[in-house]
Amino acid sequence: MADPSYTGRFSSNVDFLNGYSEYHDGDAKEVSGIETPDDYTVVFHMAKPKIDAESTLGIQKICSAKTLKYKKGKTSNVEKNNSNPIGTGPYKLKSFSKTEGASLDRNENFEAKDGEYQISKIMIKKTETSTEIKELENGTVDYIPDVVDANKINTVAKDKDKGLTMDSYPSDREDFLFMNTAAGACQDQAVRQALAYGFDREAYIESYYKLDDKDAKLAYVPGLFGNPVSGENSAYVRGEEKADGATYYDYDVEKAKQILDDAGWTVGSDGIREKDGQKLSIKFLAAKEKDAMDTMIPMLQKQWGELGVDFKANTMEFNTVISTVGDDSAVGDWDVSYLGNSFTSPEDTGVDYFIQSQGVNNFARLKDDELDSYLAAGAYTADKDASAAAYLKAYVRQAELCAYLPTDGVQTYCLRNKKVKGLNTSSTFIWSQSMATAYIDD
């Protein structure tokens, strides 16, 4: 990750170590901040503090010198090896197919404690979203994680006599619209804010996330774009508390229209707004695999249409969406898109990938010096309180810029056959991490 030829997304995982610059930019032959005093110890020396250093460095995998055998400036061989997984963990990969899934067998060389890793085989199966519940009922699938589709949850809730059940917990996931700040109408901050005020997110949630159990809550409108399971800022992100000075986009059609009026976007004879000869046209790009689009797209069509927006939606395969929004040569092909992100940890640093100017997932192409300064202050410190305060400022600043609009946070449901037990999952501890205690009760 410190090599100058590294093309991956995780260079920030090591760029704060002593010797990084000398290795990455100079002629140093090794990173001086990494020491191995014996066969079982790795010592890291940091050039500057980083709030997530312990978790970031602590999850790096240990592998053989054979796998990492390469010359500086030539990491291509290491990258090729990424498609040939190795390891000394409790399971080993038996087969893998991009179209069908994967299978893993228990590693006979792994010394597990008594009672751990009782499941001998794991099969990860690619299924159609429209038939996965039927497969769960038929027994061809035993476990479906991270379900937020109300219809599927309702089906399992009714089918408990068929041997099905579910677990639930607050999700680390936040779904969001992101707006293209580099091309098209959404370059104008006023347009972004108007679109935010003009989308009734509460109505969307009530329509899409509707459980039969009236006391159960599946989703909520987040307050800010950020990590919903943040150790310090989760209440602000989830909207349970208000942050001082933050912009909150409660549905307000008249306010949205006024913002556009004030910004010079006037309604033309055809009902579509325009400014300086440019029509207020929004090209919406979304993944067709997402069931939510059947609800969201008609709502955006109607509600943004009321603002004088020429709305055009296009759905395509998820991977095509990602490649399109990430391609600078295609920056004029879309204006707004929809994605979700699972933050996986209680640290705020995961948001850097999206809203930092050089963030690898900054699909909105947001660039703001003030925002970057808050993110840097939050990341490069060892003071937990100072980090939380800086990230909250970043969340508030991003809300004002409105490149990312959080649409829904959810309660995650994991649907399973009752015979699968011992999966002690949570928002930051997924099923694969829980295999030590999982077992099949036949």
Task: Give the predicted meaning of each segment.
Residues 199-238, 292, 297-301, 326-442:
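Detector for C-terminal structural segments
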Residues 165-179, 356-359, 367-372:
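Periplasmic-binding protein-like
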Residues 76-82, 109-155, 310:
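Ligand-site clamp/hinge motif
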Residues 29, 57-116, 121, 253, ...:
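Gly/Pro-rich hinge or "lid" segments in bacterial periplasmic/extracellular proteins
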Residues 1-2, 39-45, 89-90, 119-120, ...:
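Alpha-helical secondary-structure segments
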Residues 98, 248, 265-340, 412:
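Ligand/substrate-recognition segments at binding pockets and active sites
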Residues 148-160, 343-346:
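A ligand-binding cleft/hinge motif common to bilobed small-molecule-binding domains
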Residues 3-69:
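Surface-exposed binding/hinge segments that line
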